[in-house]
Amino acid sequence: LYSHASGTFVYGDRAKRLLIEQGISEEKLFAIHNSLDYDTQKALRESIHPSDIYKDHFQNNLPTIIFIGRLTKVKKLDMLVDALVCLRNKDEKYNLVFVGDGSESESLKSKVKGLGLDSQVWFYGVCYDEKTNAELIYNADLCVSPGNVGLTAMHSLVFGCPVITHNCFEWQMPEYEAIQAGVTGDF
């Protein structure tokens, strides 16, 4: 199928490499990379300033971890809640913010409550206002996506928030390619 097309768009360099390995001509493959509304986000990034959004909500100055995206099983967000418990057991505390909603929302809320993490976890909910998303991401210390990162990486990186996700790239979404290990995040 690919060999009959005059050209094919793919989301990333890995997909392009895999198709070349399958014998598809490099000249017919174009990596276009995924993104969000870059012009709007660039304007917001240039005008945004630090705020006390997390200090005001949590009533503390702890570092804040954010996840922005759909709260679904493939994101493995239960692992993020488990990590908070491990950190708490080592006397290291962090705030955690979930921006989004999805099929795992109620399960995550129940787990957080059962583990006594209510004061450290904020289920912000779905937010389609890009100015608010910019403030939430910009003021977070780190974005973590234990499962597939997807557009979460693009959203976080555009506002200067480093991203951590898994390093099993054959199971990852193409947006992981935007993360530069040790520079803009890690795997």
What are these regions (language model features)?
Residues 2-55, 60:
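Donor nucleotide-sugar binding/catalytic pocket of nucleotide-sugar-dependent glycosyltransferases
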Residues 11, 32, 67-69, 74, ...:
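Short hydrophobic "strand-cap" motifs at the C-terminus of beta-strands
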Residues 54-75, 80-86, 97:
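Conserved donor-binding/catalytic core segment of Leloir-type glycosyltransferases
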Residues 99, 106-127, 139:
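Nucleotide-activated donor-binding/catalytic signature segment of Leloir-type glycosyltransferases, i.e.
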Residues 134, 152-159, 176-177:
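Short alpha-helical segment that forms part of, or immediately flanks, the ligand-binding pocket
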Residues 135-148, 160-162, 168-169:
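Acidic donor-binding loop of glycosyltransferase active sites
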